[in-house]
Design a protein with these regions (language model features):
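Nucleic-acid nuclease catalytic cores
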Residues: 73, 86-114, 118-198
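Charged, glycine-rich intrinsically disordered N-terminal tails and low-complexity linkers that flank
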Residues: 1-78
Length: 198
């Protein structure tokens, strides 16, 4: 295990350029890449992409389909700072932005952008924070610190790329943080990680 490689800073980058970097690296020299949201598709648990679709996209045989939920995705992106704010306030952890595009030290195809990073107030240990939002009818997926499997794969992949031991989600679905916010945490699990990278 080793620290990740910082490939580039995505601050101010256009969406098209960001997508190019995610697909082939900033120099265009990586034949194919895997990102955190791809992992669920590889394992067949993504609600949005099948393993075959992902393979065809990565091999250049198919263009990504326009997302039916493009407005929801945009809204989720816009709400990330709110999810990060409430996580910081409720957990006491120091949360900060990191606009880097990172590459796994041992698996050059594995790239990651993190929603946020944090340092634990209890011991200063670093972690990766994934910021999510959902509708009320999806809130039960987060009940009792549950994590939807497709998101768990994503965060476990990010922990591996970042080479850190802790991760957390901040997911909200309403305007009352006392009842409408879930903040489940996970610890790095090398057995599960090996499943992802084998």
């Amino acid at each position: 295990m080793a620290a990740p490689i910082l490939l580039c800073d995505t601050t101010g980058m256009s969406n098209d350029r960001w997508l190019e970097c995610r697909m082939h690296g900033p120099k265009g020299d990586i034949p194919y890449t895997i990102g955190g949201s791809d992992v669920a598709a590889i394992f067949g648990v993504s609600p949005w992409t099948t393993p075959l679709e992902l393979w065809m996209i990565k091999r250049g045989r198919m263009k990504p389909k326009p997302k039916d939920n493009a407005d929801q995705l945009e809204m989720g992106h816009l709400l990330e700072p709110i999810a990060a704010y409430w996580y910081a306030k409720k957990s006491g952890n120091y949360v900060y932005d990191d606009k880097g595009l990172y590459q796994h030290a041992d698996h050059p195809y594995a790239l990651a952008n993190f929603d946020r990073r944090y340092e634990r107030a209890s011991d200063g240990q670093p972690g990766i924070l994934e910021c999510k939002s959902c509708t009320y009818h999806k809130a039960e997926d987060w009940a009792d610190d549950a994590i939807p499997l497709y998101y768990e794969f994503q965060l476990r992949f990010y922990l591996a790329v970042a080479d850190v031991q802790h991760g957390a989600f901040s997911c909200f679905w309403g305007n009352n943080p006392a009842n409408d916010l879930a903040m489940p945490e996970i610890k790095r699990d090398l057995v599960k990680e090996d499943m992802i990278f084998d």
